[in-house]
Amino acid sequence: MTDYSKTVNLLESPFPMRGNLAKREPAWLKSWYEQKRYQKLREIAKGRPKFILHDGPPYANGDIHIGHAVNKILKDIIIRSKTQAGFDAPYVPGWDCHGLPIEVMVEKLHGKDMPKARFRELCREYAAEQIARQKKDFIRLGVLGDWDHPYLTMDFKTEADTVRMLGEIYKSGYLYRGAKPVQFCLDCGSSLAEAEVEYKDKISPAIDVAYLFKDTAALAAAFGLAGFEGKAFAVIWTTTPWTLPASQAVSAGADVVYQLIDTPKGKLVLAKDLAEDALKRYGFSDGIAILAETTGDKLENLHMNHPFLERDIPMLNGEHVTTDAGTGLVHTAPAHGLEDYAVCNKYGIELYNPVNAEGRYIGETPRVAGMRVWEANPVILQWLEETGNLLASSKIEHSYAHCWRHKTPLIYRATGQWFVGMDKAGADGKTLRDKAIKAVDDTEFFPSWGRARLEAMIEGRPDWVVSRQRYWGTPMTFFVHKETGELHPNSAELLEKVALKIEEKGIEAWFSLDKSELLSAEDCENYDKLSDTMDVWFDSGSTHYSVVKQREELEWPADLYLEGSDQHRGWFQSSMLTGCASSMGRAPYKQLLTHGFVVDGEGKKMSKSIGNVVAPQEVYNEFGADILRLWAASTDYSGELAISKEILKRVTESYRRIRNTLSFLFANLSDFNPIEDAVQQADMVEIDRYAVVLARQLQECLAGDYYPRYAFHFAVKDIVSFCSEDLGAFYLDILKDRLYTTKADSHARRSAQTALYHITRSLVLLIAPILCFTGEEAWDIIGGGEEDSVLFHTWHEFPTINEKTEAELVKKWTAIREAREAVTAAIEPLRADKTVGSSLQAEAEITAPEEMAGYLNALGEELRFALLVSKAEVKVGSELAVAAKASDGEKCERCWHYTRDVGAVAGYETVCKRCAENVGGEGETRHYA
């Protein structure tokens, strides 16, 4: 008896169904590094149009977390997809190396008692160690880049160019020195940039305080009264009692309506809109009378006594005054608030700051001298009670600024700092704020809501405090006049001389510099070296100049910056400001892409204390980096990205669908040589031509739309859908009969293999930006061997087909697919009650509208192959309907179809006539399916 299993084309796949990614990925990485894949790619891509994604530098401290992984994976997908789209897309990874967190770690490890030069040396060593750890993890994720030559903000050349960027801004006229209130962290002992501030809820005392008017006659006149008897008070409301020792004025809104109200306390001035609530707080319900009303502009320049100090307090008009809460009058301490500073500055009131850098009151402040500000609140409340000026006291929970490092509340504190002015006219007569808002207009945003967010932040941001009183940072390399505080008139030239020294020896060249090396003897007498360092956001915000503009393989401006949504107030903004404030005069990027934060499966923020942290190292060690990459790509990054073991298991199912599809494709291509065996497009079996069109449409969608607009979750969805629906549930299901049962080198089979070759090659190229390991594994089989890379090739070139012919082909086969779905649905009850096993055991009678019936009948005897039944008949009717029944034919041992001609050919007693022809004759011919 013949064993017909040996006559079918069941081939082994060179692409295993099990990826075993966690184990195999490290070996692939080693091989690619040894082959110098990145360097070869740069050679291959020479002369192509450039695409520059500039890497926002992660901070060189601690292991990478899942947010870092998302960020680097998204960047890598873009770099790879742009490369395959025909661009030269070099990727230079970078690290942010200066700043307080590293200082804190070095102090913990080595203590504080050492020369500053040694301290900076240890900071540099610590940063280098952290970079080595993080680099290893980024490479493990499959991120392709120039890892042997990353940029570091602590590289001597980068430090020098950061100094040069400072010089650019100085020459543009935006840099100035001023004593202004800035966000100040008492634990850092330093001012903070906006990006270093986070807001959390805090419980604070909320108090109403009375300021006694000195001249009641003047107050009466302001309210249009001839006079009145008794005392009168302006009442303020504040949540920062500790600022009252610095109170220098009270501000009223010029257009706000105020009432003079007679109360048991005396006459009180309160905003009309807030008076009722305020009086309730004071417990005044009886003996109240509204005497008169006036507007805030009439109260201007009246004078009061400070509630517990001997100090004159003028009434000012301030635009910052609102009637949202409180009393409508605002106690004004220019040392502790930007708006307070602005209004006092307008009135020429000299700033008084009673709080030192440790957050303690200086010696001349009674009762609270030497205390830290937070300790002073209860003392000040007691003081107010003693003077009779505390009208109400309660607790309030409100959003308050905290240090992002220490998680402790910040204070506003006036200090002498260097600023980049937002509203100061530069050398070209334009303000930096106007330039930056114009730059926002010129930038493309992904997602689009990023534009409004960044614009609002630029419109509302204060001047940028760029100086820091720290040790491990790029120095502000200026010489300052000892008496006037003015910069040396030759600052631009001196700065360049210092930059050249820093290029050779790093920032230590400035800290160890003897003034006499650059200044005359007279200037040495009159000028001091500035000891301040620069805000680390200035370092990273200058990398478009220190890296993108300097490195030969890059081009300025960058095409894309891609970071988390917090970078609208961080790197996106600092980069824009340095770009606009320098001679470049524009944003250093054309596009901004923002991704959300990673949360757990329930949408909760990750926290070690909760125990819901998912570490990227755990994911790639268990599942493989390709699964992590597929998760990142399949999630809509414009919002929060949820991750958990359950979510990763679902992602693994999608991966398995893609992998199993590739395994099947490669098995059926293992005896196919595209040069010798390919069938011309016009000669292919019709369904093969249709399948190639579907593959080409998928490629056009991904390569022409989803990848260029960074819509990776749509790309993944369509790839999985193509594998499971277009291929798995339709084309490959139909194709198995022809692949397995026709002659190995027949036209029917070679046509199918030609289609599979185009589909496979395109599919591998399409998945490769996302599944970089799997893509390369597959390319080893279908590409040019182990030394070849999928990245060395652009998108697949499909055979051309006439547009009209294609449209007709798609229309026809869309109708056939609809009929096939109806047939499958009609057979399902027969399978459920075990009347039939597979659909091949069934016959179908189809009633279809005329056009569909025409398409079905055009397939003739091959219709049964397209419908996966043993027999099919079609008749015309008004709507689609299918009647299915079990076939009365006999099962062919070879093809498993049920026919009435099994054993019809002598010597082939257990197989059908078609199989007998395919085994012993010339083989069958197919035209349609």
Swiss-Prot record:
Name the principal localization, coarsely classed. Answer: cytoplasm
Q: How is the cofactor bound?
A: Binds 1 zinc ion per subunit.
What sort of enzyme, by top EC class, is this? ligase
Any idea which positions bind Zn(2+)?
C892, C895, C912, C915
> Residue ranges for motif 'KMSKS' region?
605-609
Q: Name one GO biological process term.
A: isoleucyl-tRNA aminoacylation
Which GO cellular component terms are attached?
A: cytosol
Q: Where found in the cell?
A: Cytoplasm
> Which purpose does this protein serve, as stated in its record?
Catalyzes the attachment of isoleucine to tRNA(Ile). As IleRS can inadvertently accommodate and process structurally similar amino acids such as valine, to avoid such errors it has two additional distinct tRNA(Ile)-dependent editing activities. One activity is designated as 'pretransfer' editing and involves the hydrolysis of activated Val-AMP. The other activity is designated 'posttransfer' editing and involves deacylation of mischarged Val-tRNA(Ile).
Q: What is this protein called?
A: Isoleucine--tRNA ligase
- Source organism per UniProt: Neisseria meningitidis serogroup B (strain ATCC BAA-335 / MC58)
Upper lineage is: Bacteria, Pseudomonadati, Pseudomonadota, Betaproteobacteria, Neisseriales
